[in-house]
Regions:
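Generic alpha-helical secondary structure
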Residues: 1, 56-57, 103
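Charge-rich, low-complexity N-terminal segments
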Residues: 1-34, 71-73, 79-82
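Hydrophobic residues embedded in beta-strands of well-ordered beta-sheets
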Residues: 24, 42, 85-87
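A short acidic-to-branched-hydrophobic micro-motif
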Residues: 35-50
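A short local loop/turn or secondary-structure capping micro-motif enriched for an aromatic residue
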Residues: 43-44, 52-54, 96-99
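Short, internal acidic amphipathic alpha-helical interface segments
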Residues: 47-92
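Ampiphathic alpha-helical segments that act as solvent-exposed interaction surfaces
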Residues: 62-63, 71, 93-126
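Short, highly charged C-terminal tails/helix-capping segments
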Residues: 122-143
């Protein structure tokens, strides 16, 4: 979708080539983010890493606390993609009728929060076990 690409560029991020009109990826803050659009909405996402097989209570509490009503995530959400145990940080918004500057601001806020969540998740995971896996370098989402 053109509005999404325009917003990504206006926010100062680098869209990556895509063969799809309603899905793609971009790079920002040294991370890769993905996006998909459908029915007038878009979801933006990135990996926070892989949830350990036996996560600590502290990690679970921190993720739930951050995700509570979207307050600690700036309206984004943290969820688990179970087949790969990947923690995803995502943000969904309407794009039909949206204006590019507002969408760019929302993306900048979303992207700005991701490194802290990744760092915190990685630190909690590494402190509790040897099975800590860093975030994927590529964006992924179930389709």
């Amino acid at each position: 979708m053109d509005i999404i690409i325009e917003a990504i560029e206006q926010a100062g991020f680098s869209p990556l080539p895509s063969n799809e009109e309603d899905a793609g990826a971009f790079e920002a803050e040294g991370l890769r983010f993905g996006w998909e659009a459908k029915d007038g909405e878009a979801v933006f996402y990135t990996s926070l890493g892989v949830l350990p097989q036996h996560p600590s209570t502290e990690l679970c509490e921190r993720l739930l606390e951050a995700d509570c009503l979207g307050i600690g995530t700036g309206g984004g959400h943290i969820g688990l993609y179970e087949p790969t145990r990947t923690l995803l940080y995502s943000f969904r918004t309407r794009v039909d009728g949206a204006d590019v500057p507002r969408l760019a601001d929302m993306l900048a806020d979303f992207v700005g929060r991701a490194p802290a969540f990744i760092r915190e998740t990685t630190e909690f995971s590494a402190a509790q076990s040897d099975e800590c896996v860093m975030p994927f370098s590529g964006a992924m989402l179930w389709v």
